[in-house]
Design a protein with these regions (language model features):
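A short, conserved, highly charged catalytic patch centered on acidic carboxylates
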Residues: 1-164, 178-185
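Basic, amphipathic N-terminal segments
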Residues: 57, 61, 230, 234, ...
Length: 701
């Protein structure tokens, strides 16, 4: 059946899958008939099945892409020349609303701004079935060889200033946007070959599935309406609105229900199983930190499973996955069944800890690599607490169900960004636990302020309050995205421009030295040239990867996550621009590209040693570069140790690379005072040492 295989995918969250499934059919465009375009696509597909495997790029365009663009209603001008040298280093197609717009643009070829302003979008085509997220050396490219198509799209969107771009190899079609945090990694992807080639599909099923392609890639999807908004813009805004709605709901639910439920479960366990009848301020702080750490882990796993960063397609892992557990819990709740086999049963909690351990240590039988430390490091105080304590099945089930469902529908963690998730949890950082509605050390009756406390029958009530004893979930200091993006852009764009000049100078020197080496036979001269080449390669690497960004009050890492995206896209665009303007300098001479290849091979080798099969396509250049940027360029400090852990979580999720360890951020994101540089006790100890004749903290004796 057609529905047995996934036909549409949301690459990295350009649109919400939940929005596409539940709200797209309510759009007026859904009622339109795609059958004429589907008939044209099927006719083209029949020819592609016979000959497509041997098509080069030009043949793919002539035999499939151009006719399909026409069937989708597009008017287009192919391969508009760049004014600088006449070299084709602009996208294959400028796409226009109609023939009149196309005719109006023709006279401006060579004037990029005037020409592309008249286009609705751009498009880039590759040979039939070519990988879209990595370089290819098969020789089937007729021009623009040795390029990463997704990186080309970043460069093209920046260069043409168009808001939308289409990238295709005939089989797979991607829609990119310039108005996102990371153009390189966020796109809507549709497996057109999977749809057209599906066997046994009923006509109605195929038509409805094709509609999800047709609605997003046809000309009408990009034409502004009377309010100046296009269909794709509306869906993008609707998806973003969905993410905000879910974030706001989760923020309230986490504060009112999930955290109190978890914390109350730990307090109950301590009373019932460990005989600890009273809690101190210190022990409540320990419970709070451990509860928040557990929440972080649940969030990490839900996010990673939703994006297939953990092997949910492996049947053995799937049966152990948190997503599978959540579905079982939802079914029991919906059927009114008991959430626990016994009052004090902890099977669900034990399974969670086992899953966390597998993520930390790896498990080849489940296809899980060893991620080695970070959030799942068993040596941390929070994780040691979690190992010594347990939660009942009921508490785990309730907490998980609240996190994964909204009004009975699954929460789309595949779309919610780490910035949305950061906003949920940042509001928890300044709170403390209260038990039985009385803050520790206070006689004030806070019951009137605690309508949503977690109640453990016959035992206790638990809630969160701020330092004023107020129960307030929204007291975070979260900066809106548009402000963050503006500040980050203003800070980094001038630096990237300067570093691009340094990179270009180093690459020019690399090209000269490599050509000299190719013709130098003298051993001494060869050695000198290689030393010079090594220095030039270090300069090229440091030009971009030597940029240092530090947030001295990082909170949840909002600014740092945006800085990672801005740097990654900026480096991609500027490297692509250099190679476009230097066609005789191959990408294989680029030290950053060579570093990406080396990192990819190191991960694959390590996975081989662990007995884990990893598709190399999962380790695409964009993901690896994002990780390199985070590993080499990003630093942060915060006074709140919980904020440090939240920032690590945000950046781990944002740079999650299959098979790569999580511990690499530990030395870059630190707990401390960015103004003083040390806590009071350290200063007092240093002063004492100075007075006794020992070396002081800030200078010599």
């Amino acid at each position: 059946m057609l529905t047995a295989t996934p036909l549409t995918t949301t690459g990295k969250s350009l649109f919400s899958q939940h929005y596409l499934e539940t709200r797209l059919p309510a759009q007026p465009e859904w009622l339109e008939d795609p059958q004429p375009a589907l008939d044209a696509a099927l006719a083209l597909w029949r020819k592609a099945q016979l000959y497509g495997a041997n098509w080069n790029e030009a043949q793919t365009e002539d035999e499939f892409v151009k006719p399909l663009l026409a069937a989708l209603g597009w008017s287009y001008i192919p391969q508009a020349k760049n004014s600088r040298s006449g070299r084709i280093n602009r996208p294959d197609y400028a796409l226009f609303a109609d023939e009149a717009s196309k005719d109006a643009a023709y006279p401006f070829q060579g004037n990029d701004d005037a020409f592309y302003t008249r286009a609705l979008a751009i498009a880039e085509a590759k040979y039939w079935g070519r990988p879209l997220s990595r370089k290819d050396s098969s020789g089937r490219d007729t021009w623009k060889t040795d390029n990463n198509p997704s990186h080309q799209m970043v460069s093209y969107l920046v260069g043409t200033r168009r808001p939308w771009g289409i990238l295709t190899n005939g089989q797979v079609w991607r829609l990119y946007s310039r108005d996102v945090s990371s153009t390189a990694s966020e796109y809507y992807e549709f497996d057109l070959a999977g749809l057209l080639g599906a066997r046994g599909a009923e006509s109605g099923e195929r038509t409805e599935a094709f509609k999800r392609f047709w609605l997003f890639f046809r000309r009408a999807a990009f034409t502004p309406d009377s309010q100046g908004r296009s269909f794709v813009q509306r869906i993008h805004e609707g998806s973003a609105s969905y993410a905000r709605e879910i974030s706001d709901k989760l923020k309230e639910l986490v504060f009112d229900e999930v955290m109190p439920e978890i914390a109350a479960g730990f307090v109950a366990y301590r009373r019932q199983q460990m005989g600890l009848r009273e809690e101190t301020a210190e022990s409540l702080a320990e419970i709070y930190h451990a509860s928040l750490s557990l929440l972080y882990k649940l969030l990490f796993v839900l996010y990673a499973e939703a994006r297939s960063l953990l092997p949910v397609d492996n049947p053995a892992y799937w049966e152990e996955s948190l997503t599978f557990v959540a579905r079982q819990v939802a079914e029991r709740i919906d059927r009114g069944l008991s959430l626990s086999e016994a009052t004090h049963a902890t099977r669900q909690y034990d399974s969670l800890l086992a899953l966390f351990s597998r993520i930390d240590q790896g498990d080849p039988s489940l296809g899980v690599p060893r991620y080695d430390g970070g959030l799942f490091n068993p040596a941390t105080p929070a994780n040691q607490f979690l190992a010594r304590h347990k939660l009942s099945d009921r508490a785990v089930a309730r907490a998980v169900d609240i996190l994964v469902r909204d009004a009975g529908q699954p929460v789309d963690y595949g779309y919610i960004s780490v910035r949305n998730l950061g906003s949920i949890y940042e509001g928890l950082l300044e709170n403390v636990l209260v038990v039985d509605a009385k803050p520790l050390g206070s006689t004030a009756d806070a019951s009137s302020m605690l309508p949503g406390v977690a109640q453990t029958p016959g035992v206790l009530n638990v809630a969160l309050v701020n330092d004023k004893g107020e129960r307030k979930a929204t007291g975070s200091f979260y900066t809106p995205d548009f402000i963050v993006e503006y500040i980050v852009g203003q800070a980094l764009d001038p630096i990237l421009a300067q570093r691009a000049e340094r990179f270009a100078a180093a690459m020019d020197q690399i090209a000269v030295l490599r050509r000299k080496l190719a013709h130098t036979l003298d051993a001494g001269a060869n050695r000198v040239l290689r030393e010079q080449l090594a220095r030039a390669e270090r300069d090229a690497l440091e030009a971009f990867l030597g940029i240092k960004v530090c947030d001295p009050a990082m909170g949840s890492g909002h600014f740092l996550v945006n800085a990672v995206d801005h740097l990654t896209d900026g480096i991609i665009q500027r490297m692509q621009a250099y190679h476009d303007s230097h066609p005789d300098t191959p990408w294989a001479w680029n030290p950053i590209q060579r570093l990406l290849e080396r990192v990819r091979q190191e991960i694959l080798n390590e996975m081989g040693r662990q007995g884990i099969a990893v598709d190399p396509a999962r380790l695409d250049d964009t993901a690896l570069l994002t990780r390199l940027v985070m590993k080499r360029c990003i630093y942060g400090v915060d006074l709140n140790p919980l904020a440090v852990e939240l920032a690590k979580l945000s950046l781990w999720l944002h740079s999650f690379t299959v098979g790569a360890p999580l511990s690499f951020l530990d030395h870059h994101l630190r707990w401390g005072n960015s103004l003083v540089g040390a806590d009071v006790r350290t200063v007092e100890r240093a002063i004492s040492q100075t007075e006794s004749g020992q070396l002081g903290l800030f200078g010599g004796p």
